[in-house]
Amino acid sequence: MAKTLYEKLFDAHVVYEAENETPLLYIDRHLVHEVTSPQAFDGLRAHGRPVRQPGKTFATMDHNVSTQTKDINACGEMARIQMQELIKNCKEFGVELYDLNHPYQGIVHVMGPEQGVTLPGMTIVCGDSHTATHGAFGALAFGIGTSEVEHVLATQTLKQGRAKTMKIEVQGKAAPGITAKDIVLAIIGKTGSAGGTGHVVEFCGEAIRDLSMEGRMTLCNMAIEMGAKAALVAPDETTFNYVKGRLHAPKGKDFDDAVAYWKTLQTDEGATFDTVVTLQAEEISPQVTWGTNPGQVISVNDNIPDPASFADPVERASAEKALAYMGLKPGIPLTEVAIDKVFIGSCTNSRIEDLRAAAEIAKGRKVAPGVQALVVPGSGPVKAQAEAEGLDKIFIEAGFEWRLPGCSMCLAMNNDRLNPGERCASTSNRNFEGRQGRGGRTHLVSPAMAAAAAVTGHFADIRNIK
């Protein structure tokens, strides 16, 4: 029987499936951070259980670390306790930890792929909703809750029901300057923020194959924002070239054997999907969200929509509420909306290609008066590479703040946050009410679009910035 990539990955990992019961899956990699793991380790301790497979468990600090100092005390009491607990737990249970002073420390979904922890064909879990990022490698990756974190630590398995399948095909080639972030925002604009609920999405089509691994990670990272359980891109030469030579990747003949298997990780011809969505890449322009969920998104050259234009009464009410929170009036051009802060970072857009794209806009320009702009690399290696390329100097000369790695202003869990009423052009993944700080107003954009907003003081079409 013809199978989708998701079905192949799922079936390959079933340990046990009793009749009328949820299948038990083997988990190849477990990524751990300081926020969702303390109670899980406490549970192990209470029952006298070890970590079943410490060699398949990798920990880092990211959510509530300071991006201005490596001092563990810098982000408050709760952050300090969580980080100290992670240090204690990893030491006690034999788990490798990339702590604040480790050169590989960074956002968990940047660190995993970068170190070759993430490989095609794997099942990967983390106590974090954006674990879908790793699906860019053709791995089945999804977020789990703290009780499930404990279950995986104890057994290296997890009960998981089968999801529905969804194919999203982006046909043709994207125009110059259009990024994976624009593509995925356009997709969510079409499906809505619940369009993928109950599904595992496979992205395909020429525009997807054209993306680098970093672009594919951005794409899969945001699949959760349309309600999907996980996202996949079938592995190809782009994937194999990225993985080759990384710290935890197979070496020599083992790598060649792995690639031979990875090449089988494709959806079979004739396999059927429960849902199919198609977009034309050439129709996608730079995207900016205007509301309080990622599906409330328009082209940078559009006007803020009028809630009355939505036929669905639920959408209309949602739009009215969103505009009131965002402090926007219907009908005004988006390019006239001024911003207070800019955040370039997060597990969506903090990799080296993202920073290069932002630096290209920032070079030779200055951050607009009254705007605070942060650039937060996703990991120690990203920061080191950016500095080797001189990107830090470009940003600093333009008036951006060059920070240490961490989740930073993506979520109000550390010192980087918005004040009430402040408007931010952000490369992160969620524009919910209060996500970046109580009363903060978040607009999601690509790194180049964020840099353009920083230097102009408002949203601007990067295609018009010479």
Curated annotation (Swiss-Prot):
Catalyzes the isomerization between 2-isopropylmalate and 3-isopropylmalate, via the formation of 2-isopropylmaleate. Its cofactor is [4Fe-4S] cluster. Pathway: Amino-acid biosynthesis; L-leucine biosynthesis; L-leucine from 3-methyl-2-oxobutanoate: step 2/4. InterPro entries: 3-IsopropMal_deHydase_lsu (IPR004430), Acnase/IPM_dHydase_lsu_aba_1/3 (IPR015931), Acoase/IPM_deHydtase_lsu_aba (IPR001030), Aconitase_4Fe-4S_BS (IPR018136), Aconitase_4Fe-4S_dom (IPR036008), IPM_dehydratase_rel_enz (IPR050067), IPMI_cat (IPR033941). Binds 1 [4Fe-4S] cluster per subunit. This is 3-isopropylmalate dehydratase large subunit. It holds the Pfam family Aconitase. It catalyses: (2R,3S)-3-isopropylmalate = (2S)-2-isopropylmalate. It comes from the Bacteria. The keyword Repeat does not apply. Disulfide bonds: none annotated. Keywords: 4Fe-4S, Amino-acid biosynthesis, Branched-chain amino acid biosynthesis, Iron, Iron-sulfur, Leucine biosynthesis, Lyase, Metal-binding. One of its GO terms (molecular function) is 3-isopropylmalate dehydratase activity. CDD domains: IPMI. Its EC number is 4.2.1.33. Heterodimer of LeuC and LeuD. Belongs to the aconitase/IPM isomerase family. LeuC type 1 subfamily. GO terms for biological process: L-leucine biosynthetic process.
